Swiss-Prot record:
Keywords: Ribonucleoprotein, Ribosomal protein, RNA-binding, rRNA-binding. PANTHER family: 60S RIBOSOMAL PROTEIN L23A. GO terms for cellular component: ribonucleoprotein complex; ribosome. It comes from the Bacteria. One of its GO terms (biological process) is translation. Part of the 50S ribosomal subunit. Contacts protein L29, and trigger factor when it is bound to the ribosome. It comes from Moorella thermoacetica (strain ATCC 39073 / JCM 9320). GO terms for molecular function: rRNA binding; structural constituent of ribosome. This is Large ribosomal subunit protein uL23. One of the early assembly proteins it binds 23S rRNA. One of the proteins that surrounds the polypeptide exit tunnel on the outside of the ribosome. Forms the main docking site for trigger factor binding to the ribosome.
Length: 96
């Protein structure tokens, strides 16, 4: 059993994710091997909130070049978490 700190890597703050906060949705980068149930339990334990829904998506790493050498960024998994009305996550406060 992994700890919540191993499942949730960090909050993802972008222009789109700050717009979703108006709908009580928060975006996180999560461990690629984590499933929706693990993500839900980790968010509820870390932030003491009630999660209604979890949407996940895998984002493929982009190709990057340095001179004549080509590489690829790592793949990553995002989770968009919908909270119960009235619940807020303090990490995101002040960003709206």
């Amino acid at each position: 059993m992994r700890t919540p700190e191993e499942i949730i890597i960090r909050p993802l703050v972008t222009e789109k994710s700050t717009g979703l906060m108006a709908d009580n949705k928060y975006t996180f980068l999560v461990d690629p091997g984590a499933n929706k149930i693990e993500i839900k339990h980790a968010i509820e334990k870390l932030f003491n909130v009630k999660v209604l829904k979890v949407n996940t998506l895998m984002e493929r790493g982009k190709l990057r070049r340095v001179g004549r050498f080509q590489g690829r960024q790592s793949d990553r998994k995002k989770a968009i978490v919908t909270l119960r009305p009235g619940d807020k996550i303090q990490v995101f406060e002040g960003l709206e």
